[in-house]
Design a protein with these regions (language model features):
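Donor nucleotide-sugar binding/catalytic pocket of nucleotide-sugar-dependent glycosyltransferases
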Residues: 37, 152, 158-202
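Conserved acidic donor-binding segment of nucleotide-sugar-dependent glycosyltransferases
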Residues: 332-346, 355-361, 376
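Short hydrophobic beta-strand element within catalytic cores of glycosyltransferases
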Residues: 293, 311, 316, 320-323
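Nucleotide-activated donor-binding/catalytic signature segment of Leloir-type glycosyltransferases, i.e.
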Residues: 255-281, 286, 290
Length: 405
């Protein structure tokens, strides 16, 4: 199949590395994939090797505007009919965001037709899905989308998009429940297909005197870093040796740095900044990390953790994890596969981390169980096969509909 993948920024930026294994696996399975980022520019942090598979144009480049004008001239009535549902956008800000991607959506319809795409798939149910939806309507090529978390909460015409799509994919049961709560109907072909990750055939066992605890997460409020830092102070007061590494960038770094200094932790807490995905996996493969921690919190209004790919990757490398019972994390970290603690509770976090650091046998047992959990639910080969089957089924249904017409 020839599949177009619409992303927010990938191959650019630092936030969509979790999509890369899925794309690679589809390519290795014999499918052609063309990546179309909604927005372009910025650093090639994770996706440098994907640029050659991408069609890159800014939202309103000369080529995009020229092609969009041509599509409007050739199929004005169909284009206006495709655009009409955008009137139902539930707020002015969402409507303006949808309007902003119209030229690129029209351009995408032309690109998909010229490339002879069999299917259009997009990640995120926001404006990337608006692009894919409009392009599908104009080109007649079936489409689908993957919804994550914030994009479900935003509810940018989610139910309307899902009715048009051949598959509304959710990465967690929690996400599907959230979508049902904002109007996703029973007539929609919706399914939970979890994110797939690359998992190594072998895992490394750390051989060090000082422990390394890693938190691979953006420095944002929902990730709960302040509770982890407070937990680290508790561990230091208990005499626990080792370092805490924070991998990720974000607006909270100055505030967290001040907290670290005020708690006298500057000698044992390190900011790694944004770590390229391949380098992060190399740390895991080399046995450089003893425990991975996510201290995520629920901020209300659906603003909580999905199923964190960062945890899946660590578990897949046999690294034991400590996480908070927030959002979709509870679907991933089951009893014996990791340590799950109350959110926003530094003492509970400290206790969970100390349990693992103080007991090598427990670390090995939890790490092995976590790895098996990741293999069973998130191996990218299985996930990509499931997606490819869904895309192929959509193509068959589309062909049958065309034959009947």
């Amino acid at each position: 199949m020839k599949i177009i993948y619409v992303t927010a920024r990938l191959p650019y930026g630092a936030d969509e590395a979790f999509i890369i294994p899925e794309i690679r696996q589809l390519q290795e399975s014999g499918h052609e994939v063309l990546i179309v980022p909604r927005s372009c520019g910025g650093p090639l942090v994770h996706g440098r090797e994907l640029v050659k598979y991408a069609s890159i144009e800014t939202l309103a480049s000369r080529r995009v505007c020229r092609t969009a004008a041509g599509v409007l001239l050739k199929a004005r009535g169909r284009a206006l009919a495709a655009l009409w549902p955008l009137n139902a956008s539930r707020s002015l800000s969402i409507a303006l965001k949808n309007v902003a991607v119209i030229p690129k959506a029209l351009w995408l319809a032309d690109v998909a037709a010229v490339w002879k795409a069999d299917h259009i798939h997009c990640h995120w149910a926001g404006t990337t899905a608006t692009m894919a939806w409009l392009a599908s309507t104009l080109s007649g090529i079936p489409w689908s989308f993957t919804a994550h978390r914030w994009d479900i909460v935003e509810n940018n015409l989610l139910a309307q998009k899902a009715r048009s799509a051949t598959l509304a994919r959710f990465i967690s049961e929690d996400g599907l429940r959230m979508a049902r709560a904002v109007g996703l109907g029973p007539e929609v072909h919706a399914a939970v297909v979890r994110m797939g990750v690359d998992l190594p055939e072998e895992t490394a066992v750390p051989e060090r005197t000082g422990a390394v605890v890693l938190c691979p997460a953006r420095l944002t409020e929902v990730k709960g870093h302040r509770f982890l830092i407070e937990a680290w102070r508790i561990l230091k007061d208990r005499g626990v040796a080792g370092e805490l590494w924070l991998a990720g960038g974000g607006e909270l770094r100055p505030r967290l740095a001040s907290l670290i200094e005020s708690l006298r932790l500057s000698n044992s807490v390190r900011f790694l900044g944004v770590v390229p995905h391949s380098e992060l996996l190399n740390l895991y493969s080399a046995g450089a990390i003893d425990v991975v921690v996510l201290a995520s919190v629920d901020l209300g209004g659906g603003n909580h953790e999905g199923v964190p790919v960062a945890l899946v990757e660590a578990m897949g490398h046999g690294i034991p994890v400590v996480a908070t019972a927030s959002g979709g994390t509870q679907e991933l970290v089951l009893p014996e596969t990791g340590i799950l603690v109350r959110p926003a509770d530094p003492v509970a976090l400290a206790d969970g981390i100390e349990r693992l650091l103080s007991d090598r046998v427990l670390r090995k047992r939890v790490g092995d169980a976590g790895r098996q959990r990741a293999l069973d639910a998130h191996h990218v080969a299985r996930v990509a096969r499931e997606l490819a089957k869904a895309f192929e089924a959509a193509q068959r249904r589309h062909a049958a509909t065309g034959a009947e017409a």
